[in-house]
Amino acid sequence: MRRTACLDRTPCPPRRKIPLYKIFPELYNGFTMNKRALDTQLKFGIPKGSLQEATVRMFKKAGFTINIGSRSYFPSIDDEEISPFLLRAQEMARYVADGALDCGITGRDWTIESGRDVTKVCELIYGKQGLRPVRWVLAVPNDSKIRKPEDLQGKRIATELVNATKEYFKNKKVNADIEFSWGATEAKVGAGLVDGIVELTETGASLKANNLRIVDTICESTTLIIANKSSWKNSWKREKIENIALLLQGAILAEEKVGLKMNVEAKNVNKIIAILPAIKNPTVSQLSKDGWCAIETIIDEAVVRNLIPKLKQNGAQGIIEYPLNKVIY
């Protein structure tokens, strides 16, 4: 090892590599860190941007409270074993693959686009506006003569999802000029800077508002939990990630369901059960009052408004509807 000379011309001792957690302790959420602490800390990436609010809400339903400051990239969480970091979904796979993060939440689209090798832990079907997959669509102005992807031969297309778009047109045997867009993609095609765009949409409302027409769907995407390959081999970290995934999946499943319970005379039980569209067979228990039972079940929230009047008409009493935080099978 080469040594530099000190002021008195004698060789200086070799420099020691200082761990990052000692140089930047704020990166580790203010916890006192040593090697043992790092081994029992899960560095978890929270997506910044469109998924941020929905993700924080899902964590809350799963039992975790995340607080994010207006200018902070280091959220706090009420679990000392988790060290969260706020990061754009587009960058998540890169930092997880490189080991800067143990795991994170991002889209399947950005994971594929990055080309990084990560473990896909589970799918979480939620987005900015609802519980459905999102789509990357090929769109053009309403008055464009372009009707099919092949009409874009030799044309210019702007998108953030460059690699997936190139693969799509390659499979179509269409030679188009695909350029990366830093933002305001919908405005570029409206201004005539490009001939078409590939843009993310949940409902299509924004495209319609910008006088754009969908030509085709490039791909669909859902939210994923991804993990670093080495972290996934660590038994403690893997169990922690799997537990978080289980609770988040339960929270998402509960989003569109409610609990329903009621009192029913024994003679009407079979009639009431026949009306209930339960996930599983409803729970029926004997009440202290002879000849009466309590029925409890979980159903889709969308059917409750039509169901309750029918239950009442068929003898159900004391009907209570209540929200659910998690549903885990």
Which residue stretches match the model-derived regions?
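Short, basic, low-complexity termini and linkers enriched in Ser/Thr/Gly/Pro
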Residues: 2-5, 28
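Short, structured active-site "lid" loops
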Residues: 83-102
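Short, positively charged and aromatic/hydrophobic N-terminal segments
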Residues: 17, 21-22, 26-32
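Small-molecule-sensing regulatory modules
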Residues: 34-81, 86, 106-122, 126-135, ...
